[in-house]
Structure formats: structure tokens, C-alpha cells
Regions:
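Active-site helix of classical SDR
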Residues: 53, 89, 97
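Residue(s) in the substrate-gating loop at a strand-loop-helix junction
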Residues: 73
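C-terminal helical subdomain
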Residues: 115, 138-173, 177, 186
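Alpha-helical segment proximal to the catalytic Tyr-Lys
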Residues: 58, 102-106, 175
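Short, small/polar-rich loop/turn modules that mediate ligand/substrate recognition or access, typified
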Residues: 105, 110-112, 177-179
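Substrate-binding pocket helix/loop in short-chain dehydrogenase/reductase
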Residues: 29-30, 37-42, 68, 147
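Active-site loop immediately N-terminal to the catalytic Tyr-X3-Lys motif
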Residues: 31, 78-84, 154, 172
Length: 190
């Protein structure tokens, strides 16, 4: 991360935007979940966000402008049976975002920190999910069918829906927003 940051600062004369967007979901009962799977999710979903923030705040302070956008999930807002480990990581991203937003504000650092919480989005994360994990014994894994049954709008979200939210939070259009959760889920959390 430090090397990536240095190359960005060299190439662009500063660092103004960080988007932390990495995640894996390993479902299953907390009783049978392997410690290695717990730690792998923590490392990718939460430690990665921490490291991005840690290494990118100093050059943002120097640039006198910054926006950090962390990708969480609706699973960071509401629990799901057999996704406890994933819930923990995405809930951690949610509260890390709020804590860092307040730290930046209290120190008068010119950095906004916000999170995006996608719902059921048409991405490869669903390809490796076990249907039983998603809806306690359900036999569906088809994303569109799942969205139709679970999401109030009955629609599946698409990566562009999330990208537009991230773009908004990274832009000056959201200059007065920090510590905010942007939920893009077709009403799933309503």
C-alpha cells in the first residue's frame, strides 16, 4: 500500500481520493467456520481498509483535500444467518469509517470519509456462495431470482449503480458529507 501511495503522489502530485473496494464472503455456521476463513475475511475486508486509510491520510493532509470512500455492505448494517463473519467485517468497515471521519474532522484535516453499502449486486461475489448460507436452507443462488424475492423493488443492482454512488462521494458534490452511509440496495434495509 505504501508503494502504491508513493507512486500515486509522484504521478499526480498528490493524493486526493481513496476508494477501498475489496471483499470476500465466506459463509457458514460460526460453529463450523475455520479460523483461517475468519482471518482471511478479516484481512481482506477490514485490515485492507485500515491499511489504505492509514497510508493515504498523510498525503491527503499535505494535499489539503481528500475523500475516502469505503465499500461496506448491507451486511454491515443488518445481520444474516450463516454470514456472521462477513457481517463482522463489513460492520467493522462501517464503524471504522465513522471513527476516522470524526478523527479527521476533530483534527481539522481536510478529508471526508464515507461508506457505501451495496445490496444484492450483480457481481462475482455471489458465484461462490452456497445457497443454504444465503437464506437458511433456500435453494436459490440465481441473483435475479434472489433479488426478486428479497428486495422490495424486486430488482438486482448493477456495478454501475454502486460506481455512481462512489463517484458522488469522491466528488466535490458531496463536500459537506462525512461519516455518512450511502445505502444502495433497492430498499433492502428500509
Amino acid at each position: 500500500m505504501a508503494e502504491c501511495r508513493s507512486k500515486s503522489v509522484e504521478a499526480y502530485g498528490g493524493l486526493h481520493i481513496l476508494v477501498n473496494n475489496a471483499g470476500i464472503a465466506i459463509g457458514g455456521s460460526i460453529v463450523t467456520l475455520a479460523l483461517e476463513d475468519w482471518q482471511r475475511q478479516q484481512a481482506i475486508n477490514l485490515d485492507g481498509v485500515f491499511l489504505g486509510i492509514k497510508h493515504c491520510i498523510p498525503p491527503m493532509i499535505e494535499s489539503e483535500l481528500g475523500s475516502i470512500v469505503n465499500l461496506s455492505s448491507v451486511a454491515g448494517i443488518k445481520g444474516a444467518a450463516s454470514l456472521s463473519a462477513y457481517n463482522a467485517t463489513k460492520g467493522g468497515v462501517r464503524l471504522l469509517t465513522k471513527g476516522v471521519a470524526l478523527e479527521c474532522a476533530n483534527n481539522r484535516w481536510p478529508i471526508r470519509v464515507n461508506s457505501v453499502h451495496p445490496g444484492i449486486i450483480d457481481t462475482p461475489i455471489w458465484d461462490k456462495m452456497n445457497p443454504e448460507v444465503l437464506q437458511g436452507g433456500a435453494n436459490i443462488i440465481d441473483r435475479e431470482e434472489m433479488a426478486e424475492l428479497s428486495v422490495p423493488t424486486g430488482q438486482l443492482g448493477y456495478p454501475l449503480d454502486i460506481a455512481n454512488g462512489v463517484l458522488f462521494l469522491a466528488s466535490d458534490e458531496s463536500r459537506y458529507m462525512t461519516g455518512t452511509e450511502l445505502i444502495i440496495d433497492g430498499g433492502l434495509c428500509a
